[in-house]
Regions:
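DNA-contacting surface of Y-family translesion DNA polymerases
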Residues: 1-110
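Acidic, metal-coordinating catalytic segment for phosphate/diphosphate chemistry
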Residues: 79, 86-196
Length: 196
């Protein structure tokens, strides 16, 4: 603002995204494919959730895994692969399944990974999907209602209350959150204890 005149207008209705990326650096050294699968599954499920929020479907998915580029003791590796979906989708099962398949093809044993991510792109509105001749509308309706129910539960109770098993439970790979504020209203362990 200059002299009460707005210089930049605020866009209250942003246009839908063409690509969605979810990625995180690991809080610990990750070498096992199981930990990578948990992180990739979590990122893929979050991408699917974001797609449904904007009522879109993705035509392709990419998976990326990286080692630490600043570690001079180890070789740098960046694995990246993309595949197209037969039919554009926002279904969590389809997206997670494709992401895990891509991870299996780019994973190299013996490396210490620092970061993983999932990108879905070429997003179109979900009401403009053209089905192939082998997919029935009934299957899509069942999966859509399942995804809607899971999204509703997660929105009302909390993120990842209901999730795919491949996302894991412990999530030791997650980013360190040492300075996180306590959640007094949502976590029993964070409640204040008073002693008399």
């Amino acid at each position: 603002e200059l002299k009460g005149e707005p210089c930049v207008s605020i866009d209250t209705n942003p246009s839908p995204k063409k690509n969605i990326c979810t990625s995180r650096s690991f809080g610990v050294k990750v070498t096992e494919i199981q930990s990578l699968k948990e992180s990739i599954s979590s990122h893929a499920a979050r991408c699917a959730e974001k797609l449904r929020e904007q009522k879109g479907c993705a035509r392709y998915i990419s998976v990326i895994i990286k080692t630490n580029p600043f570690n001079k003791l180890d070789d740098y590796y960046c694995g990246y692969k993309t595949i197209n979906f037969n039919v554009p989708t926002n279904d969590t099962m389809d997206i997670v399944g494709a992401a895990e398949t891509l991870l299996d093809s780019i994973y190299k044993k013996g490396l210490v990974y620092k970061k993983s991510g999932v990108i879905v792109g070429d997003i179109i509105p979900q009401n403009q999907i053209q089905l192939n001749m082998f997919e029935t509308d009934q299957n899509r309706i069942k999966r859509d209602s399942l995804n809607s129910a899971v999204d509703l539960i997660n929105q009302s109770i909390g993120r990842n209350t209901v999730h795919i098993g491949s996302q894991g439970i412990a999530k030791v790979w997650q980013l360190k959150q040492e300075k996180l504020s306590p959640c007094y209203t949502t976590k029993w362990g964070d409640l204040l204890r008073v002693r008399c």
